[in-house]
Amino acid sequence: MEKRKEEFLKIVCQIYMAAILVVLPLYYIPGNGYYKLGDSKYYLYRNISLICMGICLVVQIIAVVKSCLMEKHRRIEQRCRMENCASFGMYIGMYIRKTGEKMIVWCREHIVVTAVCLYGACAVASALASPYGSTAWTGEKEWYMGAVTICLMVGGFLLAAKYSGQCSRILYLGETASVTVALIGLLQKLGYDPLGLLKGYIVGDWEYTHMLTTLGNNNWLSGYYSVMFPLSLALFCKAVEEERRGSSILLGVSNTLVVILLFLQGSDGGVMVASVALWMCFWSSRKKTKLWEALLFLLTGACVGMLLWGKGMQSRGTFDILLQDGIAKRLAAWQGWLLLAAVCLLFCGVHHVLPEKKKRTLRIGVLYGSLVLAAGTVIWYILKQQGSNFAEWGNRRGRLWQMAWQGFCQGDLRQKLLGAGPDCFAGYLGQVLPGGTVLFDKGYFAGSIFTNAHNEWLTTLINMGVLGVVAYAAVFFTAFRKYRGNFMTNMLLFTYGMHSLISFQQVLNAPLFFLLLGICEAGQGQEKLHRTDTDEESIEIA
């Protein structure tokens, strides 16, 4: 009976994973347009989560009730043997003590699960203490990142951690969905619109440049790939290491398309996602010659692809579909892609003929050199910004960050500890700051109320207080500590973590992040059970 229950719950878990990784990013109701895209995706996520988690919860409750009924007679006999009330009290005390000890041991062994559950508990506590009523539970319209959604994300993590098991096929299906999304977006850049996503919009409309594939605007797209691109790269590296040539080529092409889209989508955050994930990939493969060379070929393909897509858009006259005030137009028109591709190929050739010891020295030198170059770029950028108005930085992200910090400082003790309530950022700051979170008085965003700080940590500080920030940080810290040997998880934590500094939680990134963490937790448990077994289904890359 127990085995049948486990098998059934594994099937439910795999259906849930397929819905989140495959269906959710591709889901689009024709005719709904740009502004209903977020709503439709959230309702799909909420309904699928409630159904799958509800089924699992009912099955578990039935199993617990049956177990209690079976042990009922044994417990009655134990109580009948008690000689007096004192002995019964001692029995209860011993039971509580042993249970407490077991819980402490369990929490130590499952530190990531504990941290995720604490994050969910902080969300519930914040919502219970919130003066903003239903908003704290359901969230703001079009965002829906209230306590209910956070609890569903925690539930998704727990479901995957317990029952995801061997799930490589679903991960590859998720990769297929990811590259399909990228291909639709790249076709849009060339003027093709296979799904009619841009129907009704013309050149000059804000939606014309911001409706990116089936994901929405560039912030949503970058958030999605901050989770899925590390998974895609991990699957590619695994195929290369296992010398599966066909899979390596397919996954290499897939990742190349994703990199091109991230460079053309218009947000600096997307370029950062691609750069951080690729650098992490090169760093993790610094001791692996074949993998390093495969990654150089991937980078070469991305450079050639950028050149071809730029020329294609120029010849078809579709440059107007790129964001006019973003980085995409400069990257698409840059003439140095061919030279950069040649440098990558030359480096790959030199690397190939060197002795193994010199290869490793060269790889380490290039990696540290890239770090020095990145640090120099950051320092140059900071010096360049001196004297400018910080409030205008990042399309007025600077002003949002200032607002968030002012709101936190003005809050009372309850506000500082528990926050205003999940997704109550706009409601709280609208009360304590003159003008609320309205940033623009003209243009497309004139009068728009911003519901987050475009920084997950500052948003969490306002919504869930210091306790929420500590719990959220604990998720990252414990995951990095426990899964530090897992290549995919390291990339996921760094890429998503970096992007979270300039972006926000939404239905296309946060649920997927917790789901992949749950899969890593399941893989860690399988590794403990089968230390000497090389499981083909494992996604871990040492």
What are these regions (language model features)?
Residues Y16-N32, M53-C151, T180:
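N-terminal hydrophobic segments of proteins, predominantly signal-anchor/transmembrane helices
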Residues E2-E6, S67-H110, E243-G246, D320-Q324, ...:
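Membrane-interfacial, low-structure loops and terminal tails that flank and connect transmembrane helices
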Residues S40-Y43, N47, I111, Y119, ...:
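Membrane-interface coil-to-helix junctions
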Residues R4-P25, S49-Q60, G120-L128, G146-L158, ...:
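Alpha-helical transmembrane segments of multi-pass inner-membrane proteins
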Residues P194-L212, R414-I462:
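Interfacial juxtamembrane loops and adjacent helix segments
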Residues T135-E140, F263-G266, L501-L508:
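Membrane-interface helix caps and helix-loop-helix hairpins in membrane proteins
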Residues Y28-Y42:
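Short, hydrophobic transmembrane alpha-helix segments
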